[in-house]
Amino acid sequence: MEIDFGTGCLKVTPAHDPNDYVLGKTHNLETIDIFNADATISEQSPLYVGMDRLECRKVIVPDLKNAGLIEKIEDYDNKVGYSERNSDTPVEPRLCMQWFLKMKHFADIALPCVKNDELKFHPAKYKNIYNVWLEGIQDWCISRQLWWGHRIPAYFLPTDDEEKEVYVVAMNEEEALEKARKIPGYENIEASQLRHDEDALDTWFSSWLWPISLFDGINNPGNEEIKYYYPTNDLVTAPDIIFFWVARMIMAGYEYMGDMPFRNVYFTGVVRDKLGRKMSKSLGNSPDPLMLIDKFGADGVRMGLMLAAPAGNDILYDDALCEQGRNFNNKIWNAFRLVKGWEVADVEQPEASRQAVEWFRHQLNDALATVKDHFSKFRLSDAMMVLYRLFWEEFSAWYLEAVKPAFGQPMDRATMQATLEFFDMLLRLLHPFMPFITEELWQHLDERKDGESIMYALIPEDVEADQALLKAMADVKEIVGGVRNVRKQKNLPNKEQLTLQAVGGLNNPLEAIIIKLAGLEKIDAVTEKDPTAAAFMVGTAEFAVPVAGSIDVEEEIKKLEADLEYTRGFLASVDKKLSNERFVANAPEAVVANERKKKADAESKIATMEQALQALRK
């Protein structure tokens, strides 16, 4: 309530607003219900008895004006609920008799397993939400005024006391009649005098029995199926029904089976549109999944959404997600066609291929261990991202390029066999995320027996990866990238074989891969690089590519002079900042250290460029 809004007074209508009802109970306010069941005005409003609620609203204002009771009328925004099935009909809360289930007992039996991590939530942040809700549990209204549903199993007996209801709860009318005749005064009651409650049970009251009723565990307790399948391992659901369904299944599990219904609960994110709104039928903001599948493919849609769906985090949907999934599908198809298109011959395995096979085997084992760790912690999106990068970057961009034979040349059998084994393993790892393309390609990767499917193909135990070899390959990528940058900057054709100078020598077991992917003639170990060479650093190691005979010297001098002028200007700005005593004294230590590093880097770069210019001008 805001003291400066409207009258500054609070209107409380306990019979017509859920919040007001709670407030009325707290302060013992009178409950006045002005509506009849047919939405006409009740006898509580004598002037308008029998009038439709909407018509009544139209005449009340003129009546108040005529009585001189309106000081002024102001427009303001209000939230009015409308029927989902008839958008022109406003919905009004109304008091009526409801059935409730006492919940304290159920909360007491469902709290410990989550508190003690016997039943785990993924992500764990929902554990506190669950605990707080159960600790402040309210009784559950289990009746609904619906045409369809499981009917409330209550039968009312006739009575002259309007303040007191007499009823029995029974499985059917025969049982109800039997129970009713045991009540004093109703010994001769007939079945026709019983009135079956017209309300239906809340949908969730049926759903909370799902893990049990699915295997007939209520009517046939201890049967073979319920003993085998209960409790199950994992439940996948949305966080917005953690109270409606998850908590209540746990309650029912302990109540009827004496055990939790599952060991883990994985909460997916809520899919929202670009504006952050939850997708719903009423908003019409949900794309047609069949149209998405037709446009991007089933695996494309599935994989794109999985990549964007960290556990428990909402997804801001965009078609670009599915497009990314489709592009990845295309990448897999193209890699498959490339590999299956190679001609195989009994030729010697090139050294670059041998090194590439050795490296990728360890890279695959490293990724396999990471994926298994993500799966064990229910980080499915992270697992998908590891596989996405493994296939797109490591396998396609680096491994296949390292082993690809020269144009018109065959592939050696050892490398081809290893490549097919790697492809097989990649398809197995990707299968849970992309079932259709992986099944299709796996069937064509090798000869298969009838009925054989990738669904039954096992993922082997991971072997500890050689981290030193993986680090060596990381250096290879930087060295190859450095040489490619030199080619681009100096406009050197890809066909031209270059020499790479490694100052202090190259200590890398994957040297043959560098030579092949960088298009090198050789790698020379030198104590001092050629001053006219294009240099670059990989960590603390210095490399250089001699280019004197391959470039336009005058153009290179102009470019170096321009770069030198810019770097000197940059150094001057850094010096100015470091010469400011107030900056050095007051700025965070890390910021000052970063500026000093910029100064040192600029000075080193200037010295290198001056040296190169001097060599070019000779």
Predicted regions: what they are:
Residues 2-161, 241, 277, 283-284, ...:
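Residue patterns forming the tRNA-binding/recognition surfaces of aminoacyl-tRNA synthetases
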Residues 76-87, 152-160, 264-271, 309, ...:
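A glycine-rich phosphate-binding loop feature that marks nucleotide/adenosyl-phosphate handling sites
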Residues 445-618:
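C-terminal low-complexity, glycine/proline- and small-hydrophobic-enriched intrinsically disordered tails
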